[in-house]
Structures are given as structure tokens and as C-alpha cells.
């Protein structure tokens, strides 16, 4: 009879131990950098965690499970980890579980890319975008009405059958208590990433990201920000992008999905800042740059190397809105004109811009003489306050009619169609799943 109390105690101990390991998972897991044969799994664990691993297997072959351990440091105040799984099979659905101290704390799945080149038509796919995710924190927010809105929009996004999410900057908002130290910046990333409303979304699909001023540092932060290198390290720790700039500078990178190449730009690390004058002595100011020479050289070469039908350039600030008095590429006139003139001279078809920042969504059409039009698809905000266009932007002649959305929303973007007529369809969707605006462009219409 003494066995029964012992068994009960053993069961209670086992449940308590498993619960403790669950608490050691702070946020995640999420995947990123999905490729044909590898993927990155990201998570954050508590300071009490001693060991982290990922166990994974093809869904149809659970007997072929493998494990990969995290070999980096643990036991710090914040412990984001990234584990790369290698030698996977292309076009395969995998199940995986995150193990903390040998206990399974969360399960999810990922699908490796299909090897379609020279074998089959480019696969159709859908992805989500969004920017400006402000999460309220009492005591550290601005006094008065909370700036952050309903964050249940992420629950709606979780239900989307999307292939990945592309975050377009201001993915969290640093506050005055965060700006002035590396630990402050790390706290903001850690705290906002760990919110319960985000966890299902993080695991639902792969994630890629760029930053803008508020997750880089203070409002309108530029290369003058003294913690820009520390901020870069935090961004690297919290996002599973494939790479982060070049020569240990910046966070720009590139990835591909089906027949689309994505060029993720860094508009902060190298930026002169919006407060530097556009002109000096009546001439465009050559010192004012948003991206810097090295990044622009990389972008030009990367675009020339691309054979993708759509070439998506993602950047935090609007690229083509010449009517905006806020952060926009045209306020950096020498760099802007140099790039736009280059685009006019070379034959690079299929360019589309994805941008955020503005606290409203819209599509800008930029017509060019003797060349195809450029489009700037702006999506904002996810949860921050909204802001309607003002001044010359109210009746902007370059805004595509029916695309202005001034409320919390995200983008659902589908690339589809036969190989000789690929299309990109954009929908702006609110937190209830209602479509508020639409836009579609054909790859065949993005040719010189």
C-alpha cells in the first residue's frame, strides 16, 4: 500500500518538474531562414535553463528523429538562442520540439523549400507584412491615452495560411528608459517578444525582419546613435535572418522564395538622419545619406544578379513618396537621385518596394518616362496609433485609388499565376480579418 503514495509523489514531482521547464521557455520557438536543406530555430529561455536542444523529424517518418543542441552561453539575464538544423530534405514537412533541460516545452512544424528550378513551375505562395508594433507597458509609456492598440491582430495573423512573415520595422518600440544603455535596449526586445499574444504567431510561420528607428533606438535615430552597434547585436540575437549586413556593419540581407527575391535594407545604421538638411547653399546635400555607399553598392550588384520575376526591396521608410514631409528616401536627394537614375539606365525588371513607418497603409505609383512604373506598398500600423496623411499627401496624385487604410492592419500578399503571367496581389487586412484595401500588379507590367 505504501507504493501508492510513492507513485503519487513521483507523478506530482514529474508534473512540477515539467511545469518548471515550461516556465524556462520565455518566448518562441519560431523559425527563419527557411531553405532547401536547412532552417534556423529561434527561442528565448530563462536564466535557469541549463540545456537547450531541438528534436526534429519528417512528419511521415517519426522514427528518423534527430537532435541539435545549442552550444552557446546560457545563464544570462536574457538568453535568446538560434539553432541551425542542417542536411534536411527539400520540400518536406518537418515536426519539431524544443527541449529545455531534456524536457519538451513546445512543439511546432516547418516546411523546407521546394526544389522547383528546372523541374516544375515556380510555386505560388503567400506572405504577410506589417510594421509599427507598439505594446503598452504601464509606468514606462507616455501619460494619457495608451498609444498601443488591440494586439489581438496577431491572433488573426496566426490563422493565416502564410508561408512567412516579413516585419517591416518598428517591430518593438524602445522608450526613454531603454535608450541610454545596452541593457535597456535588450530589455525592450526581451519584454515585448515574450508577450503571450505573440507566441502562437511566432510558431505559426517563419519570420524575417528589418528595423526602423524605434527598434533601432530613439525616434529618428541615425548613425549618430552611440549604441548602434549594441542595437545591431540585439537585433541579431532576436531575429533568425540569414545574415546581418557586411563587415560587421548594418543588418541588410537577402533571401528568396519561389520566383521572388527579397532585398532587406537597413535605413538606420548608416543613415545621416532626417534632421540633416536636404540641401546646403542651394544645392542637394551630398553628405545626407539614408543607406550609405557600401549598402547601395551591394544593392545595385544584388539586383543585377537577380533573375527573379519580382524583386522586392523592403525598407523601413517610404521609398517613392515625394509628397511626404516625413522620413522618405527623396529627402536624401543625392543618394535618391543616384539610385533612381541608375534604375532608369539599367534593365532591372520586376522591382517592387515594401515599406512601413507611416501609421497608415497605401500604395504609391511612381511613373517613369520610357520605363515601367515603380510601386511602393506601405503597410502600417500593426498595433501602434494610426495617423492619416496630411498636407500635400491628403489628395496625393501618386497614391493608387482605394488603397489608403488608416487603422490597424497587416498585408496579405500572394504571388501566383502561370509562369508567363505571374501576379502579386496585395490585401490590407484588419484585426478582424476584413479586407480594407486591394492592389494587384503583373510581372509582365514591370518591364522596360
PLM feature spans:
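Metal-dependent phosphoester/phosphodiester hydrolase catalytic core
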Residues: 21-448
